[in-house]
């Protein structure tokens, strides 16, 4: 599938940055932290397979939230994609509830970005699940415009645009990724600056489509040293 191939390419670029820790962020029933070694199931996709998040050798620093034992589906998919790469370093997960307020999502992102000197975020976030009549939530004429806004923001590393996404509208459109994108926006506030200068950011959308009536974007944001 094209989206999976694009995601793996983007993740390989991410791990090639050699971060101190890689945090998989995604929607979850409640806001919670996950440590390496915790597992989840792909049964939600009809695949009877268990997936483990990295190795159970994480250095133990807490990234906030209430620790839990079973990965949410979004984090399980992220862990599965991460298995397809050469990453063997420190990894953790952070699940974000769809009920998370914008300001709280930003605070989570800021905290994650400060967790280590070099933090990489793998953000697993779906667009609207109401793009077509056959979509999981049926058709909503607002869905395409919503997802176009998200795709443009991710392509341009436009954190401000992500922060303008409305929680109520996102829930109506079944756009599960809203809070996770806003965590990314919060983290970018730290990644994009230092004590002495503003860092430049290279960003690009590698994939934008809506297979099965669900909006997906694969993009990367990478900050330079100046």
Walk through the language-model features, giving the residues of each.
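Solvent-exposed alpha-helices and their adjacent loops that cap or buttress functional pockets
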Residues: 15-16, 112-116, 211
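Short beta-strand segments
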Residues: 23-28, 95-97, 122-126
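Polyanion-binding loop/helix "lid" in catalytic or ligand-binding cores
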Residues: 10, 154-208
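Cap/lid and interdomain-hinge subdomains that line or gate substrate/regulatory clefts
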Residues: 53-110
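Actinobacteria-biased recognition of intrinsically disordered, low-complexity terminal regions
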Residues: 9, 59-63, 193-196, 222-226
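A short aromatic-anchored loop/beta-hairpin motif
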Residues: 1-64, 69
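Active-site beta-strand/loop microenvironment that shapes enzyme catalytic pockets
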Residues: 99-149
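Short, basic/aromatic-enriched C-terminal tail that caps enzymatic domains
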Residues: 211-226
């Amino acid at each position: 599938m094209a989206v999976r191939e694009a995601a793996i390419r983007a993740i390989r670029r991410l791990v090639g940055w050699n971060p101190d820790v890689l945090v998989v962020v995604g929607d979850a029933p409640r806001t919670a932290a996950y440590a390496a070694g915790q597992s989840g199931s792909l049964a939600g996709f009809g695949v009877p397979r268990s997936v483990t998040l990295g190795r159970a050798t994480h250095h133990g620093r807490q990234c906030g939230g209430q620790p839990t034992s079973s990965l949410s589906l979004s984090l399980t998919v992220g862990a599965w994609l991460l298995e397809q790469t050469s990453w063997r370093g420190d990894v953790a997960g952070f699940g974000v509830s769809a009920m998370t307020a914008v300001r709280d999502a930003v605070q989570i992102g800021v905290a994650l970005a400060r967790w280590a000197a070099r933090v990489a975020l793998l953000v697993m976030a779906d667009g609207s699940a109401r793009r077509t009549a056959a979509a999981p939530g049926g058709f909503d004429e607002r869905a395409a415009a919503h997802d176009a806004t998200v795709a443009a923001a991710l392509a341009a590393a436009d954190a401000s645009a992500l922060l303008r996404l409305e929680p109520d509208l996102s829930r109506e459109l079944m756009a599960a990724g809203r809070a996770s994108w806003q965590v990314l926006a919060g983290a970018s506030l730290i990644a994009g600056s230092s004590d002495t200068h503003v860092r430049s950011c290279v960003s690009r959308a590698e994939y934008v489509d809506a297979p099965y009536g669900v909006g997906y974007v694969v993009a990367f944001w990478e900050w330079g040293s100046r």
